[in-house]
């Protein structure tokens, strides 16, 4: 059996065969299969937009004319290159009809369905945003309600074809609709409870912009209007009643000079704050006057980008903004003077790198939470805005290194539970974090996770009156956590 082998090789082969016989007698493979239960591989949800595979062109193989026996053509090495004209990517400043902005405008039946959805949102019962709202006992019990939130494959859908930059849940009481904005100007409306393969399982996709839609929210005064601000230098309003994407802000001369906008915040039912990225200014736009020119321009920074905007809920003249170099400041609109640089009311100290999010608490504005690239989640006490420099009440380590291909993490305060923060996470298993800020401390309250959540959800939003939390990832998918039916 071991002919031709040396003595050492014979001993080695004999030992191997003895061990194999021992394992077979012990039935180790059967024991292993019993101790390790079979777990089927999770298949991602196929709801929403269908994934389009890019067809790569197969080039013919290169052949050498010299080796083939042919003549090598003379090459003029000094032929000047022909420069291709640059594409004019300036955003349109005209109102768009629903059909003009709708991606599947050729499908007449789908167009009728999307118009019906907008018509229904026009008459959706409005959520009460004032302080008289009284939640049910189960709603006010934070620990209990968070424990009831689950996610399944049916609650995951691809809403936009690329990276998600903003998410906003419609605050209506009866219909659950989520607006999602993407990298190349897409805005998708997802009717979460609708399941119909013929019409993308309730996903209605528009493209009113040409560049990333960095900020989007439903109008607090009229929830039938969705406001979007894009890097293409314009802000638009989806008016469900009129069935149009109307202009909110856009200056032709500013766009022709390479201008762009990054975010917005609502100051009152008719006025909006919009940041100009390359000038360091924040403009005040009054919809009663018109969208061509802002009513007030406030020079906040010199050669810095106001990356985030938040208006004080009790003092609408006060707003908060952070920069791409680490500064975080509170300004007062009443202190704006022509084109001169504004003096901040207060500075929130401690930031050394770019801010991805800074927001006032929704109930009183007495707290501010910030996320910055130096891997910190900070909490500030802003009860007294006359303090020139405000130090953080609490700062905890938080991994904010999303890298190049993921949208930076953002914070949001719970609209109906004071002192509760929600944000995305880089931790594994993938999760959405809930933080409790009672007493000025940052304490983890819960981690929302599930088998259907397999990616980083950088952007999150919360329904004001229902236990629903939604997160968007960087491949266009939305994940919804809600109580099981």
Give the residues covered by each predicted segment.
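Active-site-adjacent structural elements in folded domains
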Residues: 340-345
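Calcium-regulated, polybasic anionic-phospholipid
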Residues: 335
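Intrinsically disordered terminal extensions that flank WD40 beta-propeller domains
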Residues: 1-164
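WD40 beta-propeller repeat fold
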Residues: 102-314, 318, 322-325, 329-330, ...
